[in-house]
Each structure stands twice: as structure tokens, then as C-alpha cells.
Amino acid sequence: MKKSPPPNPIIFYDIPSDKVGCWSPNTWKIRYALNYKGLPFRTEWVEYPDIEAKCKEIGAEPTGTRDDKPLYTFPVIQDPNTGRVVSDGPKIARYLDDAYPDTPKLFPPGTEEKQDAVFAELIQKGGPALRPLVIPPVVNILNGVSKPYFRTTREKMFGGKLEELVPQGEDRKAALEHMREAFEAFAKRLDEGGPFILGDKPNFADFIVGGFLQWFRVTLGEDSDLWQAVSVWGNGRLLKYLEDLRPYEGNPRA
């Protein structure tokens, strides 16, 4: 007999944008995961400058360090059904599999290593090229209070103005070519064994890649030449992939 969903919605902490709700690749993967598992949740939107205080308030662990200080990031979930607060995407995914074993698995037995390998290959090939193309425009979709925080922290991280990070001319063409090669190799994998990374059912790696594509779409804008380029890579296979993931999007504004 299928068990009923947990009585209390999980609280999912996310970063808002000024137009579309969810945009971050890091939080998108957990939004996908919660919807895939059919777990009720509600979103609590938190602006960038308030993330650290919110994490400390609810007892979320830091996910790294910055300037020798604890770094607090989203996604974070707070599960009133178990009393657990979990931060960091993969840790949240494993927690959801363990806490709700009667829901579809994000890490089916024996697949975690392969999932990691597929995503690592994609990011190793395309990551260095995509970051300077996609990170700077994020500042344009954030709410007012988050814009200066994002600009200050990222410019310190990258050592220059956001606008100066965006490659131009031949450098831009080269960056796009690196991205194209990486994502077309991924699209070929889907064609050979899909519709998802490991076959007929999505897994956590699919939600990670789907989150990246959502990030591109929202941040670059669907009318941008960059998104138009992405949309035709692999004969449109990436757009079909996003469409295949659509049942697990839910409402990105809610």
C-alpha cells in the first residue's frame, strides 16, 4: 500500500528573482527533487544578504568557508516531520531518499557513482566556459536588496567587475564552442540511452543538469542569442530534455 505523504509541508529555502521566482541552479535541483518525490513543501524566499542570518536562526550548517569564515548557502530544507534541517544539495537529496524511502529514489542503488561521473564530465568540459557567460547577468534578475550583495561578493571572488568578466569577440566564440561541445556530448548520451541520464526515469543528476539549463534560460533570457544557441545544440535535444523534466517543475514562483 502506498503511504500517505508527510502531514506537514517541508520548508524549502530559496532565493527570489525580480521576475520568475526560482532561478538558481543550486535550488532548482532540490525543487525538482521534492516535486519528483511528491513531497509537499512550501517555499520561504530569502534575499542574499539575509541567508546567513536565516541559516543560523534555523540551525542550518554552513556549506563551506569564505575569507576563513563559515559560508552559508542555499538550498536548505527544514523538515517539521522529523525536526531535521539539512543544507547542501547532495546531502538534502540523500536525506530525502533516507527519510522517505517509499518515494521515487534520487539515487537508485548502484547509480550514485555513475551520476557523479556524468555530471563531472559535463562540468569539466563546459564549466569554465559557461561561468563568465552566465554568472554576470544574474545581477540583472535579482531584487534590489540582493543586487549589491551579489555584485560585491562575486567581483571579489573573480577579481574584477562583473561586466569585465564577460568574454567578447573571439574569446566569446571560443567559450560558446567549449559549451557547445560539452552539451552536445551530453545530448548524444541522452539520445543513446535516454530520455534521462540513466534511462527511463530521472535521477538527481538529471535535476542538477536541468537546474543549470533553467539558470541559463532565466538569466540569459529566452530571446538572447546565447539561449537561442543553446536551444539548437544537439538538434534541440536540450530543450526536449527540459520538456521531459517539466512534470517536476511545479510552480517556480510558489
Question: What kind of region is each of these model predictions?
Answer:
Residues 118-233:
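GST-like fold's C-terminal all-alpha helical module
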Residues 2-148:
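GST-like domain detector, emphasizing the conserved glutathione-binding G-site
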Residues 243-254:
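C-terminal helix/juxtamembrane-tail motif
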Residues 25, 29, 87, 91, ...:
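Short, well-structured alpha-helical interface segments that form or flank functional binding sites
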Residues 33-36, 91, 95, 178-189, ...:
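Amphipathic alpha-helical segments that form well-ordered structural scaffolds
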Residues 234-242:
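Intrinsically disordered, low-complexity polar regions and short flexible loop motifs
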Residues 104-108, 197-199, 225, 254:
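Short, hydrophobic secondary-structure boundary micro-motifs
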